[in-house]
């Protein structure tokens, strides 16, 4: 059986998702009143998640969705995302985190240039929330279950099968994708600023930080920064 890693929300940024030659890793996330949320974060890899139990509020790229058991979520590379569960509830999910380079996003062929590289760069946006009623849901559930089986058994050549299943995932979502230009420019700028602030806090967490320092990073007044930060971070 392949090793699985339990995802601790506060440690996710430091987690190495698989290895250099096989950048693929499974995580099981469990949330409850003791740990009711995964704080906003991002990483270079994409995610495919199945909610196994409970419901939650997901925020991906500043878009909020209410997800529940049986729903699937696709988080593109470098997308800011977070989730929170209702009080007095329990949430469980299975997530596969993978780098788009594993699928060939860095190669020079038509699949990479037309599809994989744009998805990796977020210039082509695939749907993030695939509800049980979504047309792509049945096929994606079949794919997810196959990924589970192949990953757990880890038979010779299983990496090739996983790669093909992830490519199929992208292919199934492609008809429902849209160009990045459909996203408001202001939202893009806010996302970039928030990622910059979170990265700065992560790098200087041991130091005494002031609102003035963080506001300066965004070229905001302290008042504007406080409103901006509260809006997206709560």
Predicted regions: what they are:
Residues 62-77:
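Short acidic-glycine-tyrosine-enriched beta hairpin
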Residues 41-43, 81, 224:
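Histidine-centered divalent metal-coordination motifs
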Residues 121-122, 129-185, 189-192, 196:
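An amphipathic alpha-helical interaction segment
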Residues 41-58, 74:
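Short, conserved beta-strand element in jelly-roll/cupin
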Residues 171-179, 196-234:
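Basic/polar phosphate-binding segments, predominantly the helix-turn-helix DNA-binding elements
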Residues 26-43, 52:
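Conserved short histidine dyad/triad with adjacent acidic residue
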Residues 2-26, 80-149:
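A hydrophobic/aromatic-rich effector-binding and dimerization subdomain
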Residues 20, 59-63:
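Short strand-coil-strand connectors
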């Amino acid at each position: 059986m392949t090793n699985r890693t339990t995802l601790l929300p506060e440690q996710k940024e430091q987690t190495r998702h698989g290895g250099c030659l096989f950048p693929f890793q499974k995580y099981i996330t469990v949330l409850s009143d003791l740990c009711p949320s995964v704080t906003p974060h991002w990483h270079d890899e994409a995610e495919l998640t199945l909610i196994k139990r409970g419901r939650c509020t997901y925020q991906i790229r500043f878009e909020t969705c209410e997800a529940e058991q049986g729903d699937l979520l696709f988080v593109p590379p470098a997308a800011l995302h977070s989730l929170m569960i209702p009080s007095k509830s329990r949430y469980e999910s299975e997530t596969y985190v993978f780098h788009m380079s594993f699928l060939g996003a860095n190669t020079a062929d038509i699949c990479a240039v037309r599809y994989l590289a744009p998805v990796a760069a977020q210039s082509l946006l695939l749907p993030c929330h695939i509800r049980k009623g979504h047309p792509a849901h049945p096929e994606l559930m079949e794919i997810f279950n196959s990924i589970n089986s192949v990953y757990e058994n880890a038979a010779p050549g299983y990496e090739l099968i996983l790669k093909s299943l992830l490519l199929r995932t992208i292919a199934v979502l492609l008809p429902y994708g849209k160009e990045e230009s459909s996203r408001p420019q202001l939202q893009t700028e806010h996302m970039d600023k928030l990622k910059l602030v979170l990265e700065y806090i992560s790098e200087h967490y041991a130091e005494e930080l002031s609102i003035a320092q963080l506001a300066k990073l965004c070229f905001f007044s302290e008042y504007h920064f406080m409103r901006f930060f509260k809006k997206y971070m709560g």
